């Protein structure tokens, strides 16, 4: 037989302890003189009600006392307090069956709680193996253990009875996490809500979920039902699902049915699914009656449907689509006026596409004298566009595209910045702009304009020997040195150098010798120098000694022609005297 599920599981430690009576709400179960344990303070803090206090100030003071007893502010740090809060919330969000077992382990941190849950999941059958039949579990409360399930059920049933005062005694009521009977029914038939209603998200979220309605006032717990699969379908289930359904049962021998004490159902109201799972319906007409969601069992997500089988299952749940009505077009003349265009005869198969040309809508009235006010069409006709609308749409595309990138060179307009940058790069690779003066090529017209300015700039410095002009005086001076050299010592031209290089090794040796010739010669002593500054230094020190030297040193008899040389010489005297003064001390 399949494994049945019971919503109440007794913790291992509680079953071994002696039977105790529950303490009244708000009373401290600890011995006199001893403070309550943190777990007791936590439960009292969570279960505290406003009606237990005399007023709002007393209620707030009581909450402060319980919170301090739970978190122990004088002992714990901020990180430890945060760990306690996270652990309490983690245990609260666990399923009820696993939560009872984990709380019985008394974890002190979130890591210990996670390790306990993981150890429970790693064992064979996963958490469902620990869910077993239990008659009436012993309720034990010593102030440190978890809350008993019976009290939580009573509180939940009382809250649900207030929410549904008109519900019949035997009806199922949907609560926050459980599908339970009304307060008049016994608590042994309580089953988890997830076992009866399984939500499935699909592309048909807008359609109501087709479920099987149980007979009124005859609701059986999920543990007494039998889920039967074929041998082929059983092999497709994973270990978690096989642990959930229990042992293998042949589909021809059993079906999803009521317990044996229930009367048999009519064979006309049951249908078989191709995947081996049989679902029995106790309703006569699903289309005429509304199906209450609280008393429904949806087994669609429990089946390993794939491919064609899943499509057939969805077809059984979703009604057939009705044919879509024909296209309804209503036209009215635009304010601009004009004659209506000739429409085709088959308007029911055509779809007009409206293109907004501007945010204000002023340009729309200039292109089409008729505007479409209402349009309904099946989605399969969206590809067909009438001929009289294609031209208007083409014009709209040209006007709506904001081409804000203009090439400054060729004047092309681009809508996207990427295409504009790609065009500029291609322009840089090409050099279509040529200088009319020197013939240099440029990729941009701006570069060419900047280059032409160099040709048109003023050159006030002109050479008197050859007539060349220069913008800077330093360029003119370096140019005049060529004319000061003798004709035999002037540097060779480029054409002569190229001719000597092409003649052979002897010509190349001659070229090196000609370059090694001294090109600057002194006019007084006929000495030659390779550089002009060497010649100037030679004339200053050798041939200009007889000239007057007006600058004389104050510390020695040396004279100088320039004041700069005198200052540099006196600086040496000052350094020498400062060293002597330091050595004297």
UniProtKB/Swiss-Prot annotation:
Can you locate the Glycyl lysine isopeptide (Lys-Gly) (interchain with G-Cter in SUMO2) cross-link? 13, 494
Give the residue ranges of motif Nuclear localization signal.
575-579
Q: Which organism is it from?
A: Mus musculus (Mouse)
Q: Name one GO cellular component term.
A: nuclear body
The molecule here is called Zinc finger protein 496
Q: Which domain of life is it from?
A: Eukaryota
Residue spans with biased composition (Pro residues)? 26-38
Locations of Polar residues compositional bias? 387-397
Q: Does the keyword Metal-binding apply?
A: yes
Which spans does this entry mark as compositional bias, Basic and acidic residues? Answer: 11-20, 373-383
Swiss-Prot/TrEMBL GO biological process terms: negative regulation of transcription by RNA polymerase II; positive regulation of DNA-templated transcription
């Amino acid at each position: 037989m399949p494994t049945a599920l019971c919503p109440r599981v007794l913790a291992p430690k509680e079953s071994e302890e002696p039977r105790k009576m529950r303490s009244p709400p708000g009373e401290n179960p600890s011995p006199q003189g001893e403070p309550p344990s943190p777990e007791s303070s936590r439960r009292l803090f969570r279960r505290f009600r406003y009606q237990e206090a005399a007023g709002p100030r007393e209620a707030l003071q009581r909450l402060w006392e319980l919170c301090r007893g739970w978190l122990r502010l004088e002992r714990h740090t901020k990180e430890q307090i945060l760990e306690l809060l996270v652990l309490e919330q983690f245990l609260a969000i666990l399923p009820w069956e696993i939560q009872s077992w984990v709380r019985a382990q008394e974890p002190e941190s979130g890591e210990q709680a996670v390790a306990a849950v993981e150890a429970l999941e790693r064992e064979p059958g996963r958490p469902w193996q620990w869910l077993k039949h239990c008659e009436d579990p012993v309720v034990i409360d010593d102030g440190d253990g978890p809350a008993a399930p019976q009290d939580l059920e009573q509180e939940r049933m009382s809250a649900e009875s207030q929410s549904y005062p008109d519900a019949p005694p035997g009806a199922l009521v949907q609560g926050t996490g459980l599908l339970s009977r009304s307060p008049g029914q016994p608590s042994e038939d309580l089953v988890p809500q997830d076992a009866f209603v399984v939500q499935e998200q699909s592309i048909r979220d807008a359609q109501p979920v087709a479920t099987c309605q149980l007979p009124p006032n005859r609701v059986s717990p999920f543990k007494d039902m039998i889920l039967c699969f074929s041998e082929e379908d059983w092999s497709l289930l994973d270990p978690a699902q096989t642990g959930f359904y229990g042992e293998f049962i042949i589909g021809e021998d059993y079906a999803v049915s009521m317990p044996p004490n229930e009367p048999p159902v009519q064979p006309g109201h049951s249908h078989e699914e191709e995947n081996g799972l049989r679902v029995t319906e106790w309703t006569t007409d699903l289309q005429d009656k509304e199906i209450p969601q609280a008393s429904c069992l949806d087994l669609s997500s429990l089946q390993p449907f794939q491919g064609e089988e899943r499509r057939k299952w969805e077809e059984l749940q979703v009604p057939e689509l009705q044919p879509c009505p024909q296209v309804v077009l209503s036209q009215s003349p635009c304010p601009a006026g004009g004659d209506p265009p000739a429409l085709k005869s088959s308007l029911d198969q055509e779809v007009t596409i409206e293109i907004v040309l501007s945010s204000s809508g002023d340009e729309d009235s200039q292109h089409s004298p008729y505007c479409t006010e209402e349009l309904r069409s099946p989605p399969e006709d969206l590809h067909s566009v009438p001929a009289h609308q294609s031209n208007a749409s083409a014009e709209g595309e040209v006007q709506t595209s904001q081409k804000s990138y203009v090439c400054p060179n060729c004047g092309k307009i681009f809508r996207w910045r990427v295409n504009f940058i790609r065009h500029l790069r291609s322009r840089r690779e090409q050099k279509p702009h040529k200088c009319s003066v020197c013939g240099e090529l440029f990729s941009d017209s701006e570069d060419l304009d900047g280059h032409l300015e160099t040709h048109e700039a003023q050159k006030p410095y002109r050479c008197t020997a050859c007539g060349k002009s220069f913008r800077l005086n330093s360029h003119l001076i370096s140019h005049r040195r060529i004319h000061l050299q003798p004709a035999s010592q002037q540097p060779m031209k480029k054409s002569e150098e190229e001719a000597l290089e092409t003649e052979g090794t002897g010509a190349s040796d001659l070229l090196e010798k000609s370059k090694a010739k001294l090109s600057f010669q002194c006019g007084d002593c006929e000495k030659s120098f390779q550089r002009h500054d060497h010649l100037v230094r030679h004339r200053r020190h050798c041939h200009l000694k007889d000239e007057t030297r007006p600058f004389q040193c104050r510390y020695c008899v040396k004279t100088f022609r320039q004041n700069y040389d005198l200052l540099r010489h006196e600086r040496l005297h000052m350094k020498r005297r400062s060293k002597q003064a330091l050595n004297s001390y």
